[in-house]
């Protein structure tokens, strides 16, 4: 996927059978290697966490976090997409043929375009499911405890795959069309001929907005939980703080910390996908008669593909110790302000309690 001649017209790109001279598979090979390695590392870390969580929680009867079930499904989706898409591009470079010429009747081109649209949509739907799970866990805890289960989380993956399959099969039924783009190593939805490309891009945008809205709501609820935990420190100072109330406060602080870690991880993945999807969205809404170049089309596809490479590395890099450090940095200013407010509030309540005690005595 090297440099592309700007003199090549769209019709030539759609019908060419041989790759232009000077094309190199270096970038595609690097992306494939990084994607496979990152996803395998992430799956190994998730498997280790699953075993550790199962061992620690066996005595308490708690199931493994539903959030990590969804993360595992996301990493599995990214790995599956990388392994099913990248080898087609590498085969094209190895034979010096375009996707149109790899298989008769454009089968390789159709397969590549369908797989790209399918896994991109499935990834965004997985991120939306993760954001919705966090929103229900924090914002609607009663509904979450009664209706959201680990078994339901296991059903998310086949449901998302079914929805993505139905939506991405529309070009195979005549609504939209897959075509080859320069330099001949990738195919996607035809630009400017039907509304399907704009519909696909709009769906991705709506999902991104929904994920951001869920994350924003979770942030507001976490701030409220943090303030409540700060105010609870001003509770009765006699025997009540030595029994169950202290345990409840510790549990609430642990809950806030765990939810904050999940939110940081989800926010990074969401921002990454939004950045990677932006060039594709611009590509989808640009007019066919604009001054766009084939190289811009290729860069938009690369950005869309990079997301499945970055996601597992985000999970592998942002381990619990790193998340705790980030949480401490992000919450430092809030904690200092809350501490001052709490000390002031506690002093007022303490003085009021003393005055009440003097009056009653």
Curated annotation (Swiss-Prot):
Domain of life: Eukaryota
Biased composition (Polar residues): 1-10
Glycosylated residues in this chain: 6, 96, 287
Native source species: Canis lupus familiaris (Dog)
UniProt name for this protein: Prostaglandin E2 receptor EP2 subtype
InterPro entries from the UniProt entry: GPCR_Rhodpsn, GPCR_Rhodpsn_7TM, Prostanoid_rcpt, Prostglndn_EP2_rcpt
Cytoplasmic topological domain: 48-65, 133-151, 224-262, 324-361
UniProt keyword Transcription regulation present: no
Entry keyword set: Cell membrane, Disulfide bond, G-protein coupled receptor, Glycoprotein, Membrane, Receptor, Transducer, Transmembrane, Transmembrane helix
Keyword Disulfide bond part of the UniProt annotation: yes
PROSITE patterns the UniProt entry points to: G_PROTEIN_RECEP_F1_1 (PS00237), G_PROTEIN_RECEP_F1_2 (PS50262)
Topological relation to the membrane, as annotated: Multi-pass membrane protein
Disulfide bonds, paired cysteine numbers: 109-187
One of the protein's GO biological processes: negative regulation of apoptotic process
Main location: membrane
Record-stated family: Belongs to the G-protein coupled receptor 1 family.
Locations listed in the record: Cell membrane
UniProt region (Disordered), positions on chain: 1-21, 230-253
Topology, Extracellular side: 1-23, 92-111, 177-198, 287-299
């Amino acid at each position: 996927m090297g440099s592309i001649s700007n003199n090549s017209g769209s019709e030539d790109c759609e019908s060419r059978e041989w790759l232009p001279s000077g094309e190199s598979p270096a970038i595609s090979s690097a992306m494939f290697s990084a994607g496979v390695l990152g996803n395998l590392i992430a799956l190994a870390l998730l498997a280790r966490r699953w075993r550790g969580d199962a061992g620690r929680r066996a005595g308490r009867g708690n199931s493994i976090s539903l959030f990590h079930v969804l993360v595992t499904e996301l990493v599995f989706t990214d790995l599956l997409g990388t392994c099913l898409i990248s080898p087609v591009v590498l085969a094209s470079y190895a034979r010096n043929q375009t996707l149109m010429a790899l298989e008769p009747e454009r089968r390789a081109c159709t397969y590549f375009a369908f797989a790209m649209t399918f896994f991109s949509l499935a990834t965004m739907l997985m991120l939306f499911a993760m954001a919705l799970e966090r929103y229900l866990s924090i914002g609607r805890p009663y509904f979450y405890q009664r209706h959201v289960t680990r078994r339901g989380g296991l059903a998310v993956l086949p449901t998302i795959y079914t929805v993505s399959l139905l939506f991405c099969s529309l070009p195979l039924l005549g609504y939209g069309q897959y075509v080859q783009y320069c330099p001949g190593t990738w195919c996607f939805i035809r630009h400017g001929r039907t509304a399907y490309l704009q519909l696909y891009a709009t769906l991705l945008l709506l999902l991104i907005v929904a994920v951001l809205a869920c994350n924003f709501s979770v942030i507001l609820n976490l701030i409220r939980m943090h303030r409540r935990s700060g105010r609870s420190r001003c509770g009765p100072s006699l025997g009540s703080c030595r029994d169950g109330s202290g345990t409840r406060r510790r549990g609430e602080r642990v809950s806030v910390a765990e939810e904050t870690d999940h939110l940081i991880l989800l926010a990074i993945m969401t921002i990454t996908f939004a950045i990677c999807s932006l060039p594709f969205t611009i590509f989808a809404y640009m007019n066919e008669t604009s001054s766009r170049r084939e190289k811009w089309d290729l860069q938009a596809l690369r950005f869309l593909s990079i997301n499945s490479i970055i996601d597992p590395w985000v999970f592998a890099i942002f381990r619990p110790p790193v998340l705790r450090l980030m949480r401490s940095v992000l919450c430092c200013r809030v904690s200092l302000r809350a501490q001052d407010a709490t000390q002031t509030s506690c002093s007022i309540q303490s003085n009021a309690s003393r005055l009440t005690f003097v009056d009653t005595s």
